[in-house]
Amino acid sequence: MSSAAADHWAWLLVLSFVFGCNVLRVLLPSFSSFMSRVLQKDAEQESQMRAEIQDMKQELSTVNMMDEFARYARLERKINKMTDKLKTHVKARTAQLAKIKWVISVAFYVLQAALMISLIWKYYSVPVAVVPSKWITPLDRLVAFPTRVAGGVGITCWILVCNKVVAIVLHPFS
């Protein structure tokens, strides 16, 4: 495929990249949750701790506070200690989960920005599409920016239009 033919299909290339990035952005929360579940296996330990706390509370309900105060107090302290340990464990896991989601989001947006910058760089002086100039007469210079081709649609305008159209199309799915 020659360079001229590649430039002829630039509008489709940009549209597909924008569509792909927006679909990935919609799927990003699900992907982040999946990755955090894969990277964190602490939920089993937490459920075991919860089960132990439940067992101790059940045992505590069978102990008479008046007759066996020492045993009751010991068991109550043990429950409180285990509950505090569980709370700190959950806080640490939640913080790690937020960090994982943040890193995945930042990585995605950096890659998306790099992709858009590379598209702008490649098609900076070439119009992505050429339409009759009377179709865009009042805004022809703005739409053609940065190419300065009469009737041309510049890469920046095309990316904005593609983003808006794809966002409208994907809105029901997000």
Curated annotation (Swiss-Prot):
Segments passing through the bilayer: 9-29, 100-120, 149-169
Cytoplasmic face residues: 30-99, 170-174
Coiled coil: 39-94
Keyword annotations: Coiled coil, Endoplasmic reticulum, Membrane, Transmembrane, Transmembrane helix
Any one Gene Ontology BP term: protein insertion into ER membrane
Membrane topology classification: Multi-pass membrane protein
Localization of this protein: Endoplasmic reticulum membrane
Lumenal topological segments: 1-8, 121-148
Top-level taxon: Eukaryota
InterPro entries assigned to the protein according to its UniProt record, in alphabetical order: Get1, Helix_hairpin_bin_sf
An example Gene Ontology molecular-function term: protein-membrane adaptor activity
Pfam family, one: CHD5
Function: Required for the post-translational delivery of tail-anchored (TA) proteins to the endoplasmic reticulum. Together with CAMLG/GET2, acts as a membrane receptor for soluble GET3/TRC40, which recognizes and selectively binds the transmembrane domain of TA proteins in the cytosol. Required to ensure correct topology and ER insertion of CAMLG.
Summary of subunit composition and partner proteins: Component of the Golgi to ER traffic (GET) complex, which is composed of GET1/WRB, CAMLG/GET2 and GET3. Within the complex, GET1 and CAMLG form a heterotetramer which is stabilized by phosphatidylinositol binding and which binds to the GET3 homodimer. Interacts with CAMLG (via C-terminus). GET3 shows a higher affinity for CAMLG than for GET1.
PANTHER family the UniProt entry points to: GUIDED ENTRY OF TAIL-ANCHORED PROTEINS FACTOR 1 (PTHR42650:SF1), TAIL-ANCHORED PROTEIN INSERTION RECEPTOR WRB (PTHR42650)
Protein name, entry field: Guided entry of tail-anchored proteins factor 1
Organismal lineage: Eukaryota, Metazoa, Chordata, Craniata, Vertebrata
